[in-house]
Amino acid sequence: VTPTKLLIGQIAVVFAIVLLGVWAATQWCAHMLGHQAPLGAPWFIASGWPIYKPWKLFEWWFHFDAYAPEVFDKAGALAGASGFMGCAAAIGGSVWRARQRGLVTTYGSSRWAAVREIEKAELFRPAGVFLGTLKDRYLRHDGPEHVMAFAPTRSGKGVGLVVPTLLSWIGSAVVHDIKGENWQLTSGWRSKFSYCLLFNPTDPRSARYNPLLEVRRGLNEVRDVQNIADILVDPEGALERRNHWEKTSHSLLVGAILHVLYAEEEKTLARVATFLSDPQRSFAATLQRMMTTNHLGAADKPQVHPVVASAAREVLNKSENERSGVLSTAMSFLGLYRDPTVAAATSGCDWRIADLMDAERPISLYLVVPPSDISRTKPLVRLILNQIGRRLTERLEGDPKKSRKHQLLMMLDEFPALGRLDFFETALAFMAGYGIRAYLIAQSLNQTSKAYGENNAILDNCHVRIAFSSNDERTAKRISDALGTATELRSMRNYAGHRLAPWLSHVMVSRQETARPLLTPGEVMQLPPTDELVLVSGLPPIRAKKLRYYQDQNFTERVLPSPVLRDGAYGDCPAPRQDDWTGQVRSVDRRLAADDESAGATIEAEGGVQQQRHPGLPEEQTAVTQEPDQEDLFNPADDDSETVADKRVMDRISTAARAYGINEGRGDDIVPGF
């Protein structure tokens, strides 16, 4: 609409208001006078009512004022009021036209969201996670989408976002709580309707969780174990590519974990560590044990697990030095579980992943790690989150709100500190469809980029983004770009006149459209401590106020003492679920050792004594043969003649042939290792 058309429309509205007001006064006056004949004939009849021309009031007023002065005074006041209404409409229209001239969008149309737009987006609903406040009203998001917050340390993200949300969310929650503050403030209220579980691998009173018991026996066992090994070999979440040692140790860990699950009485990661580094036997003997254990067969027909046997054979086929490197690499990933406190915390399951969404009551799981141990225990917390994310997004059985008993909120404060979780990054895109919401909090964009790389999809998959005043220029620039660009009208005045004149006789005013960010990066970094920015997809940005739970009685009433933890069995936990491995113990079967083409072959040292266990001999007896020493076989300093040297060579070849005769029919190489 052009400015000229707006002006014409404004004038038409003013005249219409005045005309309707005078017409209404005329009709009211005629009604009060009883539509008498001296008033003249009506203009027309509408539904039995005589309608007079609008200006008849003034004729009647001139001729009959003396007969009914009060009636004409009131009619005149009514007509005059219409004039005032017309003036008010003219003023309002002028103001509106002035604002419309200012709403230019040549370079951009960014602006702050209006209250009616926020209401339409349902951000004032009394449900969902907390985002902040606006005009003394809570800003909350109750959709299935994820939320991401950028807030520097000590900026109020805990007291304004995490604590209020946990003190109002009635579904299940997984809370990454580094310092334990959220446990102290929110577990008391949440324990009234949910199972409150504190998992702190450095605290003997912690609830227990054994990642190996989440492995499902059967077709899924290899996949589940490989997922566990993926996290074990990448404890920091910083590997983009694995080197040779990490790849081979991954294969060894998969085989060792499967063997422990099938054969060992204690089915824990601590047992995997002690199994691979048992001081009572050599590493080669451990590999032989893996290849000769009856994992799958019955008593009359033993059968080794093919994945276990393949992993053991892969390592056994390597040279002694390479085997040692593979073992040391694998043990470096299992060192955490040698800690007795960590081993105790992972020795059993007080809760299962399925309980998070299908238990009788919601689950409130607090993953608490002291800052002093955060680097050491990071692999275990990463493993738990990885298992939760993978297991709960495997199957979609209809609407999750109907098929699941509880919705799950993953409140991950300082989530980049956990390192890169590849599955978590990709799962954000479809996690909401399974009834899982993520509330992610990071200090800055740099922290996220350091963990997930520059081109990560974390921010892209978050529907709602919250930004506090930033200390990082890159984050401030990203927020400024996200807010968009507005178009402003700048007035330029030029004054002209005589130098000695008392006033300047000519003033020229010109208006120019210019582009300006809604907030510059500097303004983002200079936001007041009480302000925050809320960006919702499909809605103009919101400049809101931070929430402080300790200033709101609705929250302070819910801050209750946390549950008391005692030594021994954890008290507040759901009913136990049956796993697939408890009670499953298998032993070595000698028939498998007899069938294996290299059973019992152990090389103690290169160039040393080779001990070969013959299937026909008792287990305690070994056949010992002296392997030819390469230096003695080909000694350039030997003074013997060529004939004598040839005879010595033939003697040693005969010795090797006799040693080979022991293994005749088993397919062993004459010279092992080649």
Residue locations for each model-derived region?
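Basic- and hydrophobic-enriched, low-structure N-terminal and domain-boundary segments
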Residues: 1-155, 159-161, 208, 351, ...
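P-loop NTPase motor domains
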Residues: 21-33, 100, 104, 138-139, ...
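Coil-to-alpha-helix initiation sites in intrinsically disordered, low-complexity, charged segments
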Residues: 42, 498-502, 648
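Short alpha-helix boundary/capping motifs
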Residues: 52-57, 358-359, 459, 507-508, ...
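Conserved ATP-driven motor cores of ASCE-family P-loop NTPases powering translocation/secretion/packaging/pilus
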Residues: 428-536
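Conserved P-loop NTPase
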Residues: 488-489, 534-538, 543-549, 553
